[in-house]
Amino acid sequence: MAGCGGLGSNNGRTTSDAQVQTADGHACNVVVASQPNGGHLHSSDCDPLTFASNPPSSGTHYPDWAKYKTYSAPVPWGFLIHCLEHGAIDIVYNCPDGCPDEVSQAQSLIDGLAPDPGCGAPMKIVLAPDPSLDIRWAASAWTWTLRTTCFDKQAFASFIAAYYQGPDTEAACGGGLDLSAIGWCP
């Protein structure tokens, strides 16, 4: 990531922060941080869960994972954490205006990624809105987060390149649930 900033350590966590210039000239603050490993125990689907970071990057989660795709409505984190366990990256946003241009840039990044080398299929990426997010854009990988004030394609591409691979060596190339049409947790 270009800009100012650097690596640091905060309570045993590694962090990297930078200010980058987006293609349209806006300044974007980007923070990448390692997070404590919250484990990978399973609870029942739709049980209430709490996490150590926002966005979450590990912890107790549901036995089912969300299908790797783009969603127009929020996906419960219990499903998304299971995606991370299988090596996926979750990209989430909280934009009161819907940020259609930024979502389009995110989709363009995802569409342009090389296939997953272990699956021969598209990379395991979930893109979804998240109204609980306390920043405009974020990404999670297993025990890593990226938090940013705007969508910066290079920052997200670098994060994906660095952290795409979770602790579970099972390929989990496909499958997953998509309950968005009927409601994730009735």
Where would I find each of the regions flagged by the language model?
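C-terminal motif of bacterial Sec signal peptides marking the signal peptidase cleavage site
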Residues: 1-3
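Surface-exposed, low-hydrophobicity interaction/linker segments
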Residues: 12-80
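Ordered hydrophobic segments in well-structured contexts
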Residues: 50, 88-92, 124-126, 138
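Mid-length scaffold segments of soluble, non-membrane domains
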Residues: 73-120
